[in-house]
Curated annotation (Swiss-Prot):
This is Mycofactocin precursor peptide peptidase. GO terms for biological process: proteolysis; riboflavin biosynthetic process. It catalyses: [mycofactocin precursor peptide]-C-terminal glycyl-N-{5-[(4-hydroxyphenyl)methyl]-4,4-dimethyl-2-oxopyrrolidin-3-yl}acetamide + H2O = [mycofactocin precursor peptide]-C-terminal glycine + 3-amino-5-[(4-hydroxyphenyl)methyl]-4,4-dimethyl-2-pyrrolidin-2-one. Its cofactor is Fe(2+); Zn(2+). The gene is mftE. Gene3D superfamilies: Creatininase. A divalent metal cation 2 binds at H40, D49, E167. Peptidase involved in the biosynthesis of the enzyme cofactor mycofactocin (MFT). Catalyzes cleavage of the MftC-modified MftA peptide to liberate its final two residues, which consist of a cross-linked valine-decarboxylated tyrosine dipeptide (named 3-amino-5-[(4-hydroxyphenyl)methyl]-4,4-dimethyl-2-pyrrolidin-2-one or ADHP). Homooctamer.
Amino acid sequence: MNSSYHRRVPVVGELGSATSSQLPSTSPSIVIPLGSTEQHGPHLPLDTDTRIATAVARTVTARLHAEDLPIAQEEWLMAPAIAYGASGEHQRFAGTISIGTEALTMLLVEYGRSAACWARRLVFVNGHGGNVGALTRAVGLLRAEGRDAGWCPCTCPGGDPHAGHTETSVLLHLSPADVRTERWRAGNRAPLPVLLPSMRRGGVAAVSETGVLGDPTTATAAEGRRIFAAMVDDCVRRVARWMPQPDGMLT
């Protein structure tokens, strides 16, 4: 596929390209993209959340290397993405692979315990809202155990919930060849608080036959560039401040 997520690109600061012998002397901090594999309507790929989280994490890591920030004095590496999450609300749609909140919580806890044996700090960059329950429990526990972990969201103020204007715009910026514009159409555009009671009973399929919440037909690459830059700026600011809440979210 024509995307930075699928195409292997040599980038300074990628954990996957380091060797074990390089790490003990540096005690790096690591940025871990956390996404999902789930339906994103008829027009976006199943790994949309993972692509966005990976691109944000990669750009944040590069910014931490380049900018004159106190926390940038540490070595920062981007880890390979965790591409499966808690996506049960999308389970009625083909292609969705959800490991659930309990399994994801344990995965993140054991991941953090292992990585903290040699890494100074851990920050998870989350691309899927359904992962928040697992993140808060796992990172909160890691912090209670004395490990310096945190997480930050890939969010956009005022964005629509799922596979609509926001995510489609970002994918038009990151992976334009993989957005099937001939298949997009508006989904349920009601506010998320209005939809949640029905979604709790029957998932996304109960409120949208296409799996879309929002309107992707208004998306543009220019808007995606702006949204993506805002996501990166927000994450860099949170990491630079490094002020985790009790649940581990960086503020």
